[in-house]
Amino acid sequence: MGGKTKQAPRTKNNAKPSSSSRTAELLGSSTPIFVGFSAQTDGGGLVPFAPGFASAEQMPDSFDAAISPQTQIILRKLSKKDPMTKKKALQELHELIEQSDVEVLKNILPLWPKYYLNLASDPEHTVREQTQTVLQLLMAKCKKAMAPYLKLLVPVWLGSRFDTYAPAASIASQSFRDTFAGNANRSREVCMHCQVEILEYATRNLTFHTAATLSIGKSLTPEDAEQKYQRVIISSLKLLSFFMGQTAQTEELSQVKEGFGTLVAHQKFWSFAKHKVPAIKAAWFECIYHILQSVALLDVITPQKTQLTNLCFQFIDDADPVVAPHIWGCVLLLQSNYVDWFVPLNIRKTLLPKLSSLLQNGFNRNAQAICPNLLPFLSKVTQASLQDLDIYDFYQRFFDDMKLAVTKKFDPPLSKSDCIVIHNAYFECLRFLMQQINNNKQREQKEEEFSFSLLDNNVLEPIAWLLKSDSTHVKIFFQHSSALVAFWDRQINNRLDNGDLYAKLLNKFWIRIFELVTQDLSAEEVNEQLLGHVLLLVQDLHMANPSLESPSVKFVEGPNEKIEKSEPTTPVKKAQEAAAFIQKELKQLVIKLVRICLDKANKGSGSGTSSSRYIEQIRTLTKMFNDAAFYKSLTDDGDLASALNKFVSLLGQLSCQACESVVEIVFEILPLLETGKRFEYIENTLMKLPQHGVQNLLLHRLLSYPLCAEAAVRQMLSGPETCEMIARIAEEVVVDNDREKLNLLHKCFFQTDTGDILINAKTVDKILLSMCGPLEQPVVDDAVEVCGSFIAQIMPVICSNNNSSLHVRQHIFLKLFKFSLEHRPEDYLSEDTLWEITTCWQDGLSSKDIEIDDDMLKCCAGIVEELANSAELKADTLDGMAEAMAKFVICSTENIEDEYKRLERIDETLTALLETPLKTTDKVQQFENHCVLLEALHGSVTAGVPFENACLSRNEILPLLQRSTLNFSTIYKLVYQFPPPQDTNDPEDELTEDYCDPNADVLKKWNEPLIAELLQCIRVAGTAECWLEMSVLQSSTEELVLILSEKVQSFMGNSSDLVAIVKERLQQAAVQQSSVIDCRLLSYLRFCPQYAAFEESASILLHEDLSENLVTQGALKTYVIALQFLLPKLSQKAITLSSAIMGTEPPEIWVKAAVFHALLLNNFEGDVNEQTDRNIIVSAVQFMTSIGERQASQKDLLHYNVEIQRQPYESVINTVEFIKLLTEVLKRFPYELSIKNWDAIRIGLSSWVLSVSKSIAQYQDPKTSLFIVAVYELFAALIDFIRSEKQKSSTELLKNMIDEWDSLFAKEVNLVLFKSYYLLTHEVSVDPGFQACYEALLEQITPVIERLDYSFVYSFCKSNSNITLDHLCNFLFKQLYSVQHSVRLSAVHSLRQLTPHFVADDIELNEKQSESLDASTTICKWHFLNRFEDYLTRYDALITKYLEEFTFKLSELDDLEPIDRHNALSYLFLWDCIINACAKSPVALRAVYTNWLNDNKYEENFLHFLFRAMPVDILKNHGAKVHSNGVYKELTWSQQKDRHLPLERYACHLYTEVLRKLPAVVRRWWNATQSRQKNFIDNLTTNYVSSLICSEELKAIANRKEKHENMQVTVHSSTREVLAVYAIDEARMELVITLAPNYPLGAVKVECGKQIGGRASSRNVGMQLTIFLTHQNGTIYDGLTMWKNNLDKKFEGVEECYVCYTVIHQETCQLPKLTCKTCKKKFHGPCLYKWFTTSSKSTCPICRNVF
């Protein structure tokens, strides 16, 4: 493969030393790394750098023999350059240390320091981290064994604590703490023990090494080397700081002082103070800080004092947050340690500019680090330190600069924490300076003037500016200003004011504040911001705390005490001492402000908003002072009444919130009045106010404690005006759902000790009537829950002490009762609220607060009837209604002490609640008849009891079912007995005192009406189960049926005497044989305890008992019908010939026939038959033969050729069951039938179809419809048998039978059955009540219609004048639009069966017209597809709206309207028939059909609609095959018959079909579309459809069994190619057809290989075939066939057409037949017609003579 020359293989684990010459040279260097300080001279010089000096320890070449080879390998890998190798070696070393004992590890300990010193400063941070992990483990394991090597490790170990990579530093710190964790002094002891090594290590790094010397022998980039050097410098400086911190308390530091003396004397050490890397700079100043802190080391740094002072003050304005704290620490220590600290400095040039810049720039956003140092710094500034600068000039400049930091707007703004710390420092310094001046008793006048100037310039001036500013500093500045003023005030009170300085300052402050506030607020228009800031200032002054809360500074108040700087602590707030000025100056200021605001509020009466904003401020101000004197001062009159009137006068012009504030003020003033005047003012003034909002506020106050306890207030609340107010509020709550108003209404119902409430009964009635309004409104919202909960909460109150009128209480009860019945928890109604409402009226009944008389009971029953008769009810609603009705029955009667009267009242109540016109006996019977007919039509049961009418609409069934479910559920809840709790030994299961017996309220006695109601509901339940099995119901209706059925099953499983009574009544009713449903109800007995215990065997045991009892009693009909219902649940062979029923001879034929039918179903459904089963077959055939013989003598026995409606019901059922038995035997055992039986079947069928023909008009007659279905099904069974027999060899008997059928019976029977079906479904008006039965009748017949022989039908209609072909087509087209799916599918099937006959006629007509030049103009008017034209036009109008909303844009897909499934399926079924007609037609006729479609542009809407109907997910992902293409696969006929077939799936199937069978039609449409639509269709077809069609077509070509003479075809599926070879004699022609990726949308590629006749001929053939495959709706094989036929004709000598130059025409597939009389050349008719049209001449294309 090339590359480098293969070298000798590497030894495993690199066990051998490196052979590299460069590596050997480096490893061979013998210069040691750690020279120590032994070579250091007294002068402090170091060993000069010499060649070969390396910063890293030299790794050993050889190892001690005691070290294992594996360990040696690991150690060698530690010295490699590759970081990955070192990391793996460290991991291996870590594992080795974990697994080895201490004795083994002692061998490597002498080597470890050398490796550690090298690896701890490795450029790769993960290597450093892993190194520290190894050291941690090694120290933990070896402990004292490491002592000899400690001095070598500690300097680097401590330096690693400050590694810039946090994980490595953390591990090093943790390992050091863990190792020396014995006591608190261990770290100091270690530092002192290794002091020489630590200082030498740090000094060497700081003064000797460079980036180059630290990286000798390492292949590092300059950047990596520099980073390593910086890490070492930082760690060394921090190491020294740590060392000084640990050894600060040590007395003997001579060696340390010597080492530090050497270090600070070296000029390179001082260079780090100006290093560009902030971390190095910060570490250096930190180191200096620790030196200055140490008293012992102060002498070491003193010689460099000048240099150090200049450095520190040079960087006093450093902006770096890491560096600045250390610099300022050094500055403060310099000021503390050296009295002459200022001597080296030029204050004007060095200090002042930098300090000013720092202050003005907001401390360079580093305030938190610098500001705490300002006060200590300022305290050390004296007049002497300022040299020639006046100290007060310095102070003024200092505060002016700092004032900018306080008031200046910074961009971006300062952080909140920075603002706080700057303000703290500002006011600390101000207070300090003021206190200094105050403490100076010998002060001069200029000092006082300076203090006044500070107050003006640095406090009052910023306040004046901030009042009008939007600065973020407003609040914090006002707080500090207030604290400063409060401090002065307290100092005055404590008599610490020397020379009245503080008093003068305070006086000046208040004068200026009064000026500022009054001047600013006296303007006509006052800014909202200004108003807010004034209020904020006043609030801060009111709450001013004299103690300056600062965690860093403590101010002493005595003149002789010192200012200290303390460590930061958490501030603890003390009890606030109110400043004396609050009740003096501040109070006057507040009074002034309130009066100003009141005046402005009155002036702004025209503007409610303007007045309201002043009221907010007034309310805030009045909260500060609320004594009588304060309020009297607010008006010129100076009394409280004037103040009240002034505030009340504002109420009419304010907002709601402002009014609330005014009312609060008013009710603060009112208690200051005398009692009589107070209530008089409320009643005569306040209660007369017209504003609704104000009235609400007043009522809220009056209804609240303590006013509500006043007798005068109670009297006010009873007044008519107050009553109207409360009623209005109740009405408003219903509308706006206001919580405040609702709370006010709740207050009205506060009960006193006597049970009375605050309002009278009339007011209560009005509230209740208003609040119950939402409970009866159809529109549901939050008001329902609010009002319902409110009424439920106050109901106990209003029912006691006659707090409301009786008729209102009853009205409210009815509303609550109806609400509980009607509603379930919803979005607008919580479960808790519904529970409150329900328990409310229940408690009212139980406590006798509400009594149910006859009128009330009638009203309650009316409510139940109204709700039960409403729209479709949900299952949970019905259950809730039943629960409420049951509770109503119990609660309304539980207080009747006389048991007899109580039971009598329960019966009356139940009768009233359950009686309904929705569920009468006649309706239940009609429902039974309806469902019995449905089930009998299905064939699962015999309608053995006569009935004349089965009409019942679904709209009538649903109310009946709902009411039955409601009634049964109600009774169920009243009579169901829960099993007693089981005794267990578990103490947790013991019954407690609060145990509630669930059977306490269960009815123990039942009257006859209750039992009759139960039985009737059970009948409805059994009938409904039949309805569910036979019908397709909505999910809600299905759920209703299942709930009723489950309730009945649960009831029948209850162990109570009532169940025993019901069981006995059910058996009695069944024995009477008066109803089919009575027989069905016997199946409910299997849920009784005696059968239910056997679970799956319950049905078998029940059948055995029924068989014995019913046959013994002679109830044979009952037994047979019950057997039919139980049959699906019985095991195989549960019925045999030895069963009791088989020993009877019933007079009715149907009983015996039904028993044999059941025998066959029960014995022959298994996989294995026994020998005894043949006896059943023989017995059944014998029974059939006997009935046939009886028919011979009794002609009217089996109703041959009669009108069924006129026959007795019982006799018709006999015939129906006999026909069903014939059908079943014919399906199962046709070869057991004798010639007599076959004659009976054929003759009987031919006669019965005549009876059907005569009776079809009376299909609504139950027995007639049953007879029709039986005859049709017998025909289907016979045709299935005959068709299967024709496919195989058969006996002579059967051959003769089939031949006789075909010749004598088939035509007539087929035609009669078709005409009967035609009459049954053509323009029939069906009674709405019979619609379901009619649909069931068609469901049974339509599958039979598919078995008709449509050749008879087509021939009949072709020659008949009553039902012509036009009638037939229109009939089938209309059925495509039928609402019944089976009818539509039957129509599709019929059209498919008729299509070959229509096509055959069109072929004949086409051939006749092909001779004429006018063929194209005549044929299109008469072909088969022309019959579709009217219906295509109708459907186009229906689908247009769907096409308009979809223009192949992805953005449209989420907004598409759902497609009407019925219309869409009908339309697609119509096109399915059209596609089938084109597919069944030959190429020539197919061209005519498709031209007709194209001329009328029908395919455009159809194909567009197909895409509109496809799944949205596929349309969204049309550009990539995200989903499976299974949805586009062809549907079988059985799949298409599925009534639940999705429309999207059928649309995809049709798209594939039309592409497969009419590709040219789709291709032509696609080519004409717009580019967006074209790309969309192309992508979808390529991704989902093309692969399916290509694989099918190629597979079809490969699987062709017939072989063409002279042509051989080969398929290459992988490349989508078809290779065709035509060979005759020596000539050979080749053709390669390649399918496009988007085939059949894209044209195929035709390549001609060897051709007879040269290149021109080859090109001609290719073009002809390409044109055919592109423009004709044929398959690839059709094109190959045409190509082969053309060649055949050529070789046969047939002359080609001189227009298209082919022998066979591409569309008509005809030979050239039209001959020119002049030149004798032959032409195709369509070619010649096209020539005439395009040339506008009627001349021969060759000789130009008139044709």
From Swiss-Prot:
Pathway: Protein modification; protein ubiquitination. GO terms for molecular function: ribosomal large subunit binding; ubiquitin protein ligase activity; zinc ion binding. GO terms for cellular component: cytosol; RQC complex. Residues 8-24 have a biased composition (Polar residues). It catalyses: S-ubiquitinyl-[E2 ubiquitin-conjugating enzyme]-L-cysteine + [acceptor protein]-L-lysine = [E2 ubiquitin-conjugating enzyme]-L-cysteine + N(6)-ubiquitinyl-[acceptor protein]-L-lysine. Its main location: cytoplasm. It comes from the Eukaryota. SUPFAM superfamilies: ARM repeat, RING/U-box. It is found in: Cytoplasm, Cytosol. A zinc finger (RING-type) spans 1697-1744. It is an enzyme of class 2 (transferase). Signal peptide: none annotated. Keywords: Cytoplasm, Metal-binding, Phosphoprotein, Repeat, Transferase, Ubl conjugation pathway, Zinc, Zinc-finger. PANTHER family: E3 UBIQUITIN-PROTEIN LIGASE LISTERIN (PTHR12389:SF0), ZINC FINGER PROTEIN 294 (PTHR12389). E3 ubiquitin-protein ligase component of the ribosome quality control complex (RQC), a ribosome-associated complex that mediates ubiquitination and extraction of incompletely synthesized nascent chains for proteasomal degradation. Ubiquitination leads to TER94/VCP recruitment for extraction and degradation of the incomplete translation product. This is E3 ubiquitin-protein ligase listerin. It comes from Drosophila melanogaster (Fruit fly). The lineage of its organism: Eukaryota, Metazoa, Ecdysozoa, Arthropoda, Hexapoda.
